[in-house]
Amino acid sequence: KIGKWWLLDAWKENPQAHAGVQLAAVPGARSFVTIPGDKIIHPAVIFAVVHGHGGEDGVIQGLADTMHIPIVGSDTIASAVCWDKVITKQMLESYGIKTAPYKVHHLGEPVPNYEELLSQLGSPLFVKPARSGSSIGVSKVESAEELNAAVTLAHEHSNAILIEQALLGRELEVSVLGNPPHHKVSKVGQIIPGEEFY
């Protein structure tokens, strides 16, 4: 969030005193140089366990590609596409995969008429930023007043937002490690939210 990284060895020595460092990439050498300081880091692999903007959206993955350093997890294109819910939905639809009916709203456009949305999408609705994760900026909407507040909140996180039909049912997740034909698929997990939605 602040453009600094915590080096594990220094952090373990004194977590409170370690303020983080900036890293300068040296692509030809597959390394990073710390700023301040002159420590050179040669990572063998990158574990991208950073959430949110810059972590899940293809930025770190693209840096790893540029540096020719292997990275664990989704590659640059998969990360970027899946981070943008509008692009994800358009791609799924192009392959005939059903998604919840939705409308896209862009910053600066008038808030859609609630009654018209109900006739097109039903109730309740979910309003969510197109580019965000972890349910940040997501609202469940059941009135015109809630719609206005939800659109404002979602636009704090993304210029494009989705207004989507709420689907009732179980939410399942599956992890895939590797690429065909050598990929491995996890067991199916069910998400049981602790709140009204996950």
Question: Language-model segments: which ranges?
Answer:
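Phosphate-binding site of ATP-dependent enzymes
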Residues: E142-Y198
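Glycine-rich phosphate-binding loop of ATP-grasp-fold ATP-dependent ligases
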Residues: A100-V104, L125-T152, E171-E173
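Basic phosphate/pyrophosphate-binding loop/patch that engages nucleotide-derived ligands
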Residues: M91-T99, L153
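Short gly/pro/ser/thr-enriched loop/turn and capping motifs at secondary-structure boundaries
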Residues: I77-C82, G133, G194-E195
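ATP-grasp fold ATP-binding core
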Residues: L92-E93, L118-I136, N159-L168, L172
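Glycine-rich phosphate/pyrophosphate-binding beta-alpha loops
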Residues: G52, S135, I191-G194
